[in-house]
């Protein structure tokens, strides 16, 4: 049993709180809003972000980050990618010296295109062997409902990955370890962008052929980019690559897919965000960073380019699909 601090009470942070508690650990859950922490503590529910799920008694909720972080062996970051640097900068003095930090958000820093593990290292001063990434086909509601799922815990230090793995293994949640942090992070980021494209196609009532094409060619550009950044190509055929991509592109529970559908139906970014209960899909924040990384490494990412054109350049989904189909023919 270890002491776990989960920093962020959104749907995924709350779900992983339940997983760590069900694995036999004591867990403190930090919520940014006082009322969310109070509701969890008094009712064992988080109706705003994870309705209908009972939060175990082993969980203590608080809105005080110092209280949440005190004596934690594992610190799980559940804040959105755009908030990671500022949050860790504020919490740096409270972080226990020996704690492992586990990253949940699947995004890139908007201005720098840095991966979350890189941002965490810079903001916390921790070495890479103390920073892990959790990534895989993990839709929060399904995991919270204890439907069988698997994931990947990636860290450059296998022993650290093993510690996190042991702390979050339950009868319904099976983590595997990996030392390819770059591959697991790029797989998690890119699939959000590809899922936006899949949602856009679904919003146009396009069928399975189109969906399969987007997933397959999306995987191809993810492998190209990841390999250029130093990832192991084999990672992308595993849970943190293909597994996550398939789940996120196909499920109606996927925020990125749903967001893409809204955009395809003519909504603006602001309207789509409102339709998604005020939450922006990570793929919207990541698509330009993916494009920037790809250009810096001379990698072709046509689907990501198409998503950028719809989200930020005023292109319609139909125009973007036509542009993709009219590209020069080539070998697969």
Swiss-Prot record:
Source species: Corynebacterium kroppenstedtii (strain DSM 44385 / JCM 11950 / CIP 105744 / CCUG 35717)
Annotated positions binding NADPH: 11-12, 32-33, 106, 140, 255, 280, 282
EC number(s) on file: 1.1.1.94
Subcellular location: Cytoplasm
Organism lineage string: Bacteria, Bacillati, Actinomycetota, Actinomycetes, Mycobacteriales
Pathways involved: Membrane lipid metabolism; glycerophospholipid metabolism
GO molecular function: glycerol-3-phosphate dehydrogenase [NAD(P)+] activity; NAD binding
InterPro entries: 6-PGluconate_DH-like_C_sf (IPR008927), 6PGD_dom2 (IPR013328), G3P_DH_NAD-dep (IPR006168), G3P_DH_NAD-dep_C (IPR006109), G3P_DH_NAD-dep_N (IPR011128), NAD(P)-bd_dom_sf (IPR036291)
Record PANTHER family: GLYCEROL-3-PHOSPHATE DEHYDROGENASE, GLYCEROL-3-PHOSPHATE DEHYDROGENASE [NAD(+)] 2, CHLOROPLASTIC
Alphabetic keyword roster: Cytoplasm, Lipid biosynthesis, Lipid metabolism, NAD, NADP, Nucleotide-binding, Oxidoreductase, Phospholipid biosynthesis, Phospholipid metabolism
The gene coding this protein: gpsA
Protein name per UniProt: Glycerol-3-phosphate dehydrogenase [NAD(P)+]
Reaction catalysis annotation: sn-glycerol 3-phosphate + NAD(+) = dihydroxyacetone phosphate + NADH + H(+); sn-glycerol 3-phosphate + NADP(+) = dihydroxyacetone phosphate + NADPH + H(+)
GO process terms (BP): carbohydrate metabolic process; glycerol-3-phosphate biosynthetic process; glycerol-3-phosphate catabolic process; glycerophospholipid metabolic process; phospholipid biosynthetic process
Binding site for sn-glycerol 3-phosphate: 106, 136, 191, 244, 254-256
Gene Ontology CC terms, in alphabetical order: cytosol
Origin: domain of life: Bacteria
Active site: 191
PROSITE patterns tied to this protein: NAD_G3PDH (PS00957)
NCBIfam families with a match to the protein in the record: PRK00094.1-2, PRK00094.1-4
Physiological role: Catalyzes the reduction of the glycolytic intermediate dihydroxyacetone phosphate (DHAP) to sn-glycerol 3-phosphate (G3P), the key precursor for phospholipid synthesis.
Similarity annotation: Belongs to the NAD-dependent glycerol-3-phosphate dehydrogenase family.
């Amino acid at each position: 049993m270890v002491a776990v601090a989960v920093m962020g009470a959104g749907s995924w942070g709350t779900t992983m709180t339940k997983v760590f508690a069900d694995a036999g650990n004591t867990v403190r859950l930090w919520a940014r809003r006082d009322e969310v922490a109070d509701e969890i503590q008094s009712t064992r529910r988080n109706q705003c972000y994870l309705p209908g799920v009972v939060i175990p008694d082993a969980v203590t909720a608080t809105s005080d980050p110092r209280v949440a972080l005190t004596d934690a062996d594992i610190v799980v970051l559940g804040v959105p990618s755009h908030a990671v640097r500022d949050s860790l900068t504020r919490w740096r003095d409270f972080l226990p010296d020996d704690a492992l930090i586990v990253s949940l958000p699947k995004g890139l820093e908007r201005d720098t295109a840095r991966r979350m593990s890189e941002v965490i290292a810079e903001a916390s001063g921790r070495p890479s062997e103390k920073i892990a990434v959790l990534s895989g086909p993990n839709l929060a509601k399904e995991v919270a409902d204890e439907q069988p799922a698997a994931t990947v815990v990636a860290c450059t230090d296998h022993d650290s990955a093993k510690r996190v793995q042991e702390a979050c293994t339950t009868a319904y949640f099976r983590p595997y370890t990996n030392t390819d942090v770059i591959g697991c992070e790029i797989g998690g980021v890119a699939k959000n962008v590809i899922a936006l494209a899949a949602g856009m196609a679904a919003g146009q009532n396009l069928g399975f052929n189109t969906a399969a094409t987007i997933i397959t060619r999306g995987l191809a550009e993810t492998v190209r980019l990841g390999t250029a950044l130093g990832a192991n190509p084999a990672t992308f055929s595993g849970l943190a690559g293909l597994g996550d991509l398939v789940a996120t592109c196909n499920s109606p529970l996927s925020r990125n897919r749903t967001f893409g559908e809204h955009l395809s139906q003519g909504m603006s970014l602001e309207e789509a965000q409102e339709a998604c209960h005020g939450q922006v899909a990570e793929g919207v924040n990541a698509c330009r960073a993916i494009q920037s990384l790809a250009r810096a490494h001379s990698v072709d990412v046509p689907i990501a380019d198409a998503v950028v054109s719809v989200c930020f350049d005023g292109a319609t989904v139909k125009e973007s699909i036509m542009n993709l189909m009219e590209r020069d023919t080539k070998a697969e």
